[in-house]
């Protein structure tokens, strides 16, 4: 009795295997994810064009979603008034971010708070606060680079103008899409962000060294000025001392001459008295 061979389709197993490789090998780097999407979709496309296209767009959508989950919420505020905000997710992170905003110091600085596996990153500058909520595993470098990009773009568009009088959430339509673009860019280009951060850190370090050297030079300049002032004072004091010395010498000379004249006068008087007493007055012959 002939046994018929039942063909088994390997497509589901291939799909699961490739998708598992995709998730486990490049889960933390969206940039590598997109490269893997292209290579895997080309391999799948060689089997079936239609299936390959569907596979490509499916993986690309997964990549985009995973990348966007790294930065989940952002806003720009004037004081405590949120002018524009953007998110594609739901959760209490918006309320937590707003509560942190109320307690932020008004001085220009950067702040990061950790809560429930997320980081709440703030950049405060000139009365405006830029915030982004990120997954804790992303670190601090990408969120801070995102805030710098948002700050520069926001200042170019609204610096000294509309933002100073805008009402709460009034800039959502104009600038909300920009927040989304900056989020996606920072997530898609982590290597570039890392390089820029290193360059900025080096520039900041060099700037700090230069400022320290300038302060030392200025400090030395102040010391030199003090030495010059002291030299001038010593020269002036020496001149005064010479003048006073001359006056004292003259005074002492006059005092000595006066004493000598008095002594000479006393001697002459004594001589006259002796002569007069011997001669019996002025009749001495």
Swiss-Prot record:
All residue ranges annotated as the Longin domain in the record: 75-179
Residue ranges annotated as Vesicular topological domain: 283-285
Alphabetized UniProt keyword annotations: Cell membrane, Coiled coil, Endosome, Membrane, Protein transport, Transmembrane, Transmembrane helix, Transport
Subcellular locations according to the entry: Cell membrane; Early endosome membrane
Pfam families in the cross-refs: Longin (PF13774), Synaptobrevin (PF00957)
Protein origin, superkingdom: Eukaryota
GO biological process, any: vesicle-mediated transport
Keyword field contains Amino-acid biosynthesis: no
Main subcellular localisation: membrane
InterPro entries associated with the record: Longin-like_dom_sf, Longin_dom, Synaptobrevin-like, Synaptobrevin-like_transport, V_SNARE_CC
Function: Involved in the targeting and/or fusion of transport vesicles to their target membrane.
Family per record: Belongs to the synaptobrevin family.
Name of the molecule in the record: Vesicle-associated membrane protein 725
Organism: Arabidopsis thaliana (Mouse-ear cress)
Native organism taxonomy: Eukaryota, Viridiplantae, Streptophyta, Embryophyta, Tracheophyta
């Amino acid at each position: 009795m002939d046994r018929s061979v039942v063909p088994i389709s390997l497509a589901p197993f291939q799909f699961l295997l490739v998708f598992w490789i995709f998730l486990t090998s490049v889960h933390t780097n969206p940039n590598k994810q997109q490269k893997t999407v292209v290579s895997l979709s080309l391999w799948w496309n060689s089997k079936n064009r239609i299936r390959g296209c569907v596979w490509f767009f499916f993986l690309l959508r997964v990549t985009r979603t995973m990348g966007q989950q790294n930065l989940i919420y952002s806003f720009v505020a004037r004081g405590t008034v949120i002018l524009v905000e953007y998110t594609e997710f739901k959760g209490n992170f918006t309320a937590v971010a707003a509560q942190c905003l109320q307690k932020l110091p008004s001085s220009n600085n950067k702040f990061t708070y950790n809560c429930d596996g997320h980081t709440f990153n703030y950049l405060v500058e000139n009365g405006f606060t830029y915030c982004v909520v990120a997954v804790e595993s992303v670190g601090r470098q990408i969120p801070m680079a995102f805030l710098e990009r948002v700050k520069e773009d926001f200042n170019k568009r609204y610096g000294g103008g509309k933002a100073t009088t805008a009402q709460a959430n009034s800039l959502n339509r104009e600038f909300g899409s920009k927040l989304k673009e900056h989020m996606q860019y920072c997530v898609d280009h982590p290597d570039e962000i890392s390089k820029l951060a290193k360059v900025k850190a080096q520039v900041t370090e060099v700037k700090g060294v230069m400022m320290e050297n300038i302060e030392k030079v200025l400090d030395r300049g102040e010391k030199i000025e003090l030495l010059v002032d002291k030299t001038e004072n010593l020269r002036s004091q020496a001149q005064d001392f010479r003048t006073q010395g001359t006056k004292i010498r003259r005074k002492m000379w006059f005092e000595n001459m006066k004493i000598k004249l008095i002594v000479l006068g006393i001697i002459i008087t004594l001589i006259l008295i002796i002569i007069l007493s011997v001669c019996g007055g002025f009749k001495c012959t």
